[in-house]
């Protein structure tokens, strides 16, 4: 069975059972909280008490932003697993299906367009399901996922990697082949208060041929920021999104037209080896 079919109540139960192997979490309670969070995400009216643990985490995160001391410990809370499952069900799973659909490029898939490639990096791979999906789509490629080391998600993804033949690392500098073929980043760059600087780090070190990116800088979620920084300036979500695209274009990337819903993930291909000097970005 393909990983994209790992959804629904049974899929969630299996997921939480695996979570309980690495973290102290009440499976029954987490199941209810996760289901209610998904319903709320879809527009249903859900009492905050029925998803209390997630509301506590969300309030803790945004309170820390108000004091300008981001509380990154939220990622180590066992109930953050609920948030990550919702992201899988509502977003990254759909992106995997989109890029493998023959409809995504009017008669052929994005995967077909990319063709045979050496390696793929899944930035911010969560608990590893999207990385499994990448291995299914590119079975002959070396697949890597990145995540913060020693948190619960890293442990789960590492175990999946051993089972499905991919490797989890803390950051891309630990990957020996610095020129990757494809980088996939789903709801990743929003978790950095300086996403442009981080994007530049990725491009300077890696310079992939293709990038599949789904950003929601305007979206409210645990780990997202109210505003973003670049150099000495501050930007709202819409502004940083425009600057993100500008940066990619300056590095020689162009968007490839697709039929993906709402252009997510955006498909970028490196067309030119020239780029503006790094100093230009840092001074903008």
Across the structure, where does each feature detected by a protein language model lie?
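Conserved acidic residues
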Residues: 118, 181, 209
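A short, conserved alpha-helix within the catalytic core of class I
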Residues: 192-202
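Conserved beta-strand signature within the Rossmann-like core of class I S-adenosyl-L-methionine
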Residues: 208-217
